[in-house]
Curated annotation (Swiss-Prot):
UniProt-listed GO biological process terms: mitochondrial electron transport, NADH to ubiquinone
Function summary: Core subunit of the mitochondrial membrane respiratory chain NADH dehydrogenase (Complex I) which catalyzes electron transfer from NADH through the respiratory chain, using ubiquinone as an electron acceptor. Essential for the catalytic activity of complex I.
EC number, UniProt record: 7.1.1.2
Encoding gene (name): MT-ND3
Catalytic class of the enzyme: translocase
Family named by the database record: Belongs to the complex I subunit 3 family.
TM stretches of this protein: 3-23, 55-75, 86-106
Principal cellular location given in the protein's record: mitochondrion
Organism: Ceratotherium simum
Catalyses which reaction(s): a ubiquinone + NADH + 5 H(+)(in) = a ubiquinol + NAD(+) + 4 H(+)(out)
Topological relation to the membrane, as annotated: Multi-pass membrane protein
Protein name: NADH-ubiquinone oxidoreductase chain 3
Pfam family, any one: Oxidored_q4
Subunit structure: Core subunit of respiratory chain NADH dehydrogenase (Complex I) which is composed of 45 different subunits. Interacts with TMEM186. Interacts with TMEM242.
Length: 115
């Protein structure tokens, strides 16, 4: 009963906060708040300029490699396990996957900025 009450209260509170967050910004729409801010100066140009897909691809590549590196961080603690052979096999597979994905990005010219 206590668990159900806690889940209900947490779900209700989260739902109310999400509804308020979507409802409040629609009440007061100011042009000053909607305009871009450039360190106190008037904007030089439009803030809605399109950007090249290279930025997006570099960001996605960074996130993927960052995630794979984060998976390698617990390896020093995993080396203290009793089954060292399994840990080394998994680490080798993960490092091989990281190297293969880097080689794929390199061959597909995903790391080159100039076209």
């Amino acid at each position: 009963m206590n668990l159900m009450l806690t889940l209900f209260i947490n779900t209700s509170l989260a739902s109310v906060l999400v509804l308020i967050a979507f409802w409040l910004p629609q009440l007061n729409i100011y042009t000053e708040k909607a305009s871009p801010y450039e360190c106190g100066f008037d904007p030089m140009g439009s803030a809605r300029l399109p950007f090249t897909m290279k930025f997006f691809l570099v960001a996605i590549t960074f996130l993927l490699f960052d995630l794979e590196i984060a998976l390698l961080l617990p390896l020093p603690w995993a080396s203290q396990t009793t089954n060292l052979k399994t840990m080394l096999t998994m680490a080798l597979i993960l490092i091989s996957l990281l190297a293969a994905s880097l080689a794929y990005e390199w061959t597909q010219k995903g790391l080159e900025w100039a076209e």
